Amino acid sequence: MEGPTHPKPFKDKTFSWDLIILVGVVRVLLRLDVGMANPSPHQVYNVTWVITNVQTNSQANATSMLGTLTDAYPTLHVDLCDLVGDTWEPIVLDPSNVKHGARYSSSKYGCKTTDRKKQQQTYPFYVCPGHAPSMGPKGTHCGGAHDGFCAAWGCETTGEAWWKPTSSWDYITVKRGSSQDTSCDKNCNPLVLQFTQKGRQASWDGPKLWGLRLYRTGYDPIALFSVSRQVSTIMPPQAMGPNLVLPEQKPPSRQSQTKSKVATQKPQTNGTTPRSVAPATMSPKRIGTRDRLINLVQGTYLALNATDPNKTKDCWLCLVSRPPYYEGIAILGNYSNQTNPPPSCLSTPQHKLTISEVSGQGLCIGTVPRTHQALCNKTQQGHTGAHYLAAPNGTYWACNTGLTPCISMAVLNWTSDFCVLIELWPRVTYHQPEYIYTHFDKAVRFRREPISLTVALMLGGLTVGGIAAGVGTGTKALLETAQFRQLQIAMHTDIQALEESISALEKSLTSLSEVVLQNRRGLDILFLQGGGLCAALKEECCFYADHTGLVRDNMAKLRERLKQRQQLFDSQQGWFEGWFNKSPWFTTLISSIMGPLLILLLILLFGPCILNRLVQFVKDRISVVQALILTQQYQQIQQYDPDRP
C-alpha cells in the first residue's frame, strides 16, 4: 500500500480537525535553579527526559540519568504505538471530517490489533517540528497542530522515508529501530530519538512539540508528541526551624560533650545468649560557628603536630578573619577517569566557591591561558567524550567556574575552561610566641616586622605529595592519621556551614528590615509618655543578645599570663638593659654619641704612648743623620803594622 511518488499534492495532506486544545499539553515546567542564579556547569543532576503523547496527554517514555546539563543527552527509545495510542483507530476519528472519501473502517494502520502493528512497520514516516515554526522554508506555511506542523512539503526535518528528510537546525532526529518481537504481541515499532548538536545547545526550560505523520496513500495520519527535560538534585536540600543564622551563634561546646558515649550491655549470668541490640540512630547535632572555628584551628594543629612536632612545642596558630578564608596549593596527583559520575560528583555544594589565592605548581587540565600558566607544572588537554575526572580524596579542581571535586570533560571541551588540581587549606597563620607577646608589650621600642607563614605553605602537598615521598621513607601512614582527617572534616564542615549561612543570611534581610522600620517608627513617637515604645507599637520588642562575655574572660586570662611573663622577664633583666626602657629618646641619644665617645676614649688612653714612641723614633733618626754628616769631613788613615814584612 505504498503511496504515490513524492511530492504528493497539497490537498492530499490536508486534514480538517477541530482545533486541538493544547492546554493540557503545554505544561509549565519550572526551571530548576538549584538555589542560585548561576549553578556550576560541573554540577551533576538527576536528568529525566519525558516523551509525552500530546493527544492523550499520557507519558510514552521517561529516561533518567545522572550528568551535567551539558552532557546529559541520552538516546531515547519509544514505541510508535505509545506515541499514537488509540488516536488512529476508526472508532476514535470522526469520518465526517475526513476529506477525499477516505474511510477509516477499512484502514490498515493503528495499534489496535496485531496485524495493524505489523502493517505499520511498512509505512515510512516523517517528523515536523512545532517548537520553531519560523525556521521553516521561506514562503511555506507549515500549519499548526491540526496539520501536524506538516501542512506543506519542506517542513519535515527528520524521519524514515525514501527521500531521507534532514535538517541543520532541528533539535532531534527520529529513526526506526530494530525489533526482536516478530509476533507483535507487545510493541514492535520501536523508534530511536537522538539529540543533534543544536539540540544540545538549546534551552530546554519547557517542552518542545513535534508532529509525526505516516506516508501512505490518501490521508497521512498525525501523531503529536512533546519532549521535555526535568532536572532535580540528587539530594534536595531541606530547611527546618526558624532563622538558622542568629540562633546557631552559640558558645563552643565543652570538651566532654564532643566525646561519643557508647552504651554497654550488662553481662548476663543466666547463660542465655545475649540478643544483639541495634544501635539507635540519632540525627547529627548542628554545631555552632565557634565550634567550627575551633575545629579548624584544632585540626590544623593536629596535622602540623603529626608532620613536624618541633614546630608545635611553642607557637601560635591564628585563624585569619578577613577574606580569603581558604587558599589552594597546586599539586600533582593521579585523578580517576570514569564514564559514569562517581560518588564525589554527587555531593557538590549548591553555591559556587571561588579560591582567590592559588600558589605552587601542579596538574592543569584544559586550555590554560598565559596568565595562569605559572600554576602548571604539567598540562593535559583532557579527553574526548563524556568522561568524569574525579580528584583524589582531599583535593579539588579549581576551575574558572568555581571549586568542584570532579569535572565533566564534555563541559570542559564545550566551554574552553581550564582547571588546576589543588589542596584546600584554611587560612591559618603560624607565629612564634614572641609575635603575640609583642602586641601586648608596653615597651616603646619599635620591633622588626615578623614574618608570617601560613600552615598551607608548611603542609602543602601532604595529601598527594606525601604519598610519593612516603613510599621509600615509610611516612605514607601519615596520610591515614586521624589528625589530618580531622582537619579535612573540619574544613568540609566549615564550607558547608558557610554555604548554609549565605542562604540563611539572604532570608534574614527581611527580619533585619523589620527591626530597622521598628526603630524608625519609634523615633516618630519619641515623646510618648506611657507604656514605652513596644507597648505603643503593639509589637514584640527586639533585643540584642550579647555573647562577648566569654571573649572578655579569655582576654583577661591572656593579659594575666602576659603580665606574669613580663614580670619574669623583668626579674631576669640586668640594670643596664633597663635603661633602654626608660625613655624613647634615650636609646637614640646613646646610639648617636656612643661612637664619638669611644673614639675620644681610645685617643686619651693610647695617645701618649703612641706619641712617646713617635718622638723617640724621630730622635734616633736625627742622631744617625748627624753622625753621617760628621764623618763626611774626615778621611780614614791607613794603619801600618811594623811587624809585618
From Swiss-Prot:
Glycans are attached at N46, N61, N270, N305, N310, N334, N337, N377, N393, N413. Residues 517-533 are annotated as: Immunosuppression. A motif (CXXC) lies at residues 315-318. A motif (CX6CC) lies at residues 534-542. It comes from the Viruses. The keyword Oxidoreductase does not apply. Residues 451-471 are annotated as: Fusion peptide. InterPro entries: FMuLV_rcpt-bd, TLV/ENV_coat_polyprotein. Disulfide bonds join C128-C150, C142-C155, C315-C318, C315-C542, C534-C541. Residues 611-645 are cytoplasmic. A lipid is attached at C609 (S-palmitoyl cysteine). Residues 252-275 have a biased composition (Polar residues). Specific enzymatic cleavages in vivo yield mature proteins. Envelope glycoproteins are synthesized as an inactive precursor that is N-glycosylated and processed likely by host cell furin or by a furin-like protease in the Golgi to yield the mature SU and TM proteins. The cleavage site between SU and TM requires the minimal sequence [KR]-X-[KR]-R. The R-peptide is released from the C-terminus of the cytoplasmic tail of the TM protein upon particle formation as a result of proteolytic cleavage by the viral protease. Cleavage of this peptide is required for TM to become fusogenic. The CXXC motif is highly conserved across a broad range of retroviral envelope proteins. It is thought to participate in the formation of a labile disulfide bond possibly with the CX6CC motif present in the transmembrane protein. Isomerization of the intersubunit disulfide bond to an SU intrachain disulfide bond is thought to occur upon receptor recognition in order to allow membrane fusion. The mature envelope protein (Env) consists of a trimer of SU-TM heterodimers attached by a labile interchain disulfide bond. This is Envelope glycoprotein. It comes from Feline sarcoma virus (strain SM) (Sm-FeSV). The gene is env.
